[in-house]
Amino acid sequence: MKTLYSLRRFYHVETLFNGTLALAGRDQETTGFAWWAGNARLINLSGKLLGAHVAHAGLIVFWAGAMNLFEVAHFVPEKPMYEQGLILLPHLATLGWGVGPGGEVIDTFPYFVSGVLHLISSAVLGFGGIYHALLGPETLEESFPFFGYVWKDRNKMTTILGIHLILLGVGAFLLVFKALYFGGVYDTWAPGGGDVRKITNLTLSPSVIFGYLLKSPFGGEGWIVSVDDLEDIIGGHVWLGSICIFGGIWHILTKPFAWARRALVWSGEAYLSYSLAALSVCGFIACCFVWFNNTAYPSEFYGPTGPEASQAQAFTFLVRDQRLGANVGSAQGPTGLGKYLMRSPTGEVIFGGETMRFWDLRAPWLEPLRGPNGLDLSRLKKDIQPWQERRSAEYMTHAPLGSLNSVGGVATEINAVNYVSPRSWLSTSHFVLGFFLFVGHLWHAGRARAAAAGFEKGIDRDFEPVLSMTPLN
C-alpha cells in the first residue's frame, strides 16, 4: 500500500516522547503511549483498534442482556415498573412487547427473550473482540484494503462516515417497521388509558416534522421534546432514516469539497472529538426528552414527569374539595389568586397554586377535561372519571423529585416510600454523561487542532522530575 506522506506529519502529536515510530507493539517505546492511554496505543494499528471496538461493543451488549435478565428476575407484575427501579423493561414495554391496555404487563417472556438474545450476541462480539485484539492481523491495510484506512485519507473517512449513516438510518427504520407491521408500539394516548396499537396514519408532512426543529426550546414550545403523538414520532423516524441513508450513500460516492478539506482537521483525534461532540448533544437531548416527554416515555412505565406529578396533585385536591362542597371555580387561595383554578396571562383556565408554572403540561388523564379555553369548568364538575382520579393520585405520590427546594408544590413526606423515579435516574445520568462527553470533546479538539497547527503542549520528557527519582521497587 502506498503511503502518501511522511509518518512524522501523519500523527506527530502522539509521538512527543520518543523518536521511534515503528508500527509494531503496543508499549510506550513503540507508540509513545503507556498502557493506561488505552486505544491511543492503537492509532496506527487498524486491526488491533478493530478488536478494541468490537470487544467494547461486546461489553455494551453484555450489560444490556445481563441487566435485562436481572430486571426480569426481580420484576413483580403487580407493581408499576417505575416503583421497581427498572430502566430497561420500560423501554421494551414502550415498544409494545408484553403489555396490554393501560400498560399492564401480561407476558414477561418477550423480556426474557430480549435478554437472552443480547447475551448470545455479546458472546459473538466478545469472541470477535478477543480474536482481533490478540490473534488477528495488526493492520488491515495490506490484507483487507476495504477495511483498512489511513486517518488522513479524506475520501476513505467520508466513506466510513457514509457507512455509519446508513446503519443509523436502518436503525431508525427498524422502529418504523415495528410500529407499522410488527405488532405496533405502546400509545399512552390511546382511548381509555393507553394501549398497544399499530401506527397507520404516519405524519410525513415536512412542515410538521421540521416545524419541531424550528420551535423555541422554552416552555409551551419545547422544540422536538414537545412531540406528543406517535404519528409524528414514527413519521419523524421515516424522515430521519431516509436522510441518514441518502446522506450515507452521498458520502460514500463523493469526496469532501474544498471548503470542508480546509475547514476540518483530518486526524484520528479530530474524528474522536467530533464523535464526542455528537454524543454529548445526544445525551443532553435525551436528558430533556426523558424528563419532560410522556409520549415517547410513557408515564405508565417511567412514572410521571415532574410537571405531571405537580398537576396531578392539584387535580387530586380539586376533586376532593369539590366533593366536600367547595366551589372550585371561585375559591380564592392565600395569594389572592384562584385556589384551584386561575387564568394564565393568555386567558386559558389552568390549575392554581404553585403548579401554575406547569400550565403547559399535556397528559392523557387530563386532556379530556380541557375545552377551547383551557380546563372546562363544567367538565370538571360532571365528567371526571374514576380512572382519572386513580391515575392522578398515583402520579401525585410518585413525583420524580430529587430536589431540596423547588418541588412545584408537591407535598413531600420525610417518611415516604423509598422511591427514586427512573426519570430521575435516566435524565440525571444522561446529563452527566453528556457533560463529560462535552469536556472530552473540548480536550481532544484542542489537542487535534494544536497538532494540525504544528505545535504541541506537553511536558518535556527529558527533564521530567520522576526520571531522577528512585524506582518504586
UniProtKB/Swiss-Prot annotation:
Binding, [CaMn4O5] cluster: 367
Modified residues (N-acetylthreonine): 15
Disulphide bonds in the chain: none
Sorted UniProt keywords: Acetylation, Chlorophyll, Chloroplast, Chromophore, Manganese, Membrane, Metal-binding, Phosphoprotein, Photosynthesis, Photosystem II, Plastid, Thylakoid, Transmembrane, Transmembrane helix
Organism of this sequence: Arabidopsis thaliana (Mouse-ear cress)
GO cellular component, one term: chloroplast stromal thylakoid
Membership in a protein family: Belongs to the PsbB/PsbC family. PsbC subfamily.
A GO term for molecular function: mRNA binding
Record lineage: Eukaryota, Viridiplantae, Streptophyta, Embryophyta, Tracheophyta
Protein name per UniProt: Photosystem II CP43 reaction center protein
Segments passing through the bilayer: 69-93, 134-155, 178-200, 255-275, 291-312, 447-471
Residues bearing the modification Phosphothreonine: 15
One Pfam short name: PSII
Endpoints of the signal sequence: none
Co-factor remark: Binds multiple chlorophylls and provides some of the ligands for the Ca-4Mn-5O cluster of the oxygen-evolving complex. It may also provide a ligand for a Cl- that is required for oxygen evolution. PSII binds additional chlorophylls, carotenoids and specific lipids.
InterPro entries in the record: PS_antenna-like, PS_II_antenna-like_sf, PSII_PsbC, PSII_PsbC_sf
Function field: One of the components of the core complex of photosystem II (PSII). It binds chlorophyll and helps catalyze the primary light-induced photochemical processes of PSII. PSII is a light-driven water:plastoquinone oxidoreductase, using light energy to abstract electrons from H(2)O, generating O(2) and a proton gradient subsequently used for ATP formation.
Modifications made to the protein after synthesis: Phosphorylation occurs in normal plant growth light conditions. Rapid dephosphorylation occurs during heat shock.
Residues bearing PTM Deamidated asparagine: 18
Membrane topology of the entry: Multi-pass membrane protein
Subunit structure as annotated in this protein's UniProt entry: PSII is composed of 1 copy each of membrane proteins PsbA, PsbB, PsbC, PsbD, PsbE, PsbF, PsbH, PsbI, PsbJ, PsbK, PsbL, PsbM, PsbT, PsbX, PsbY, PsbZ, PsbC/Ycf12, at least 3 peripheral proteins of the oxygen-evolving complex and a large number of cofactors. It forms dimeric complexes. Interacts with PAM68. Interacts with HHL1.
GO terms for biological process, alphabetical: photosynthetic electron transport in photosystem II
Zinc in keyword set: no
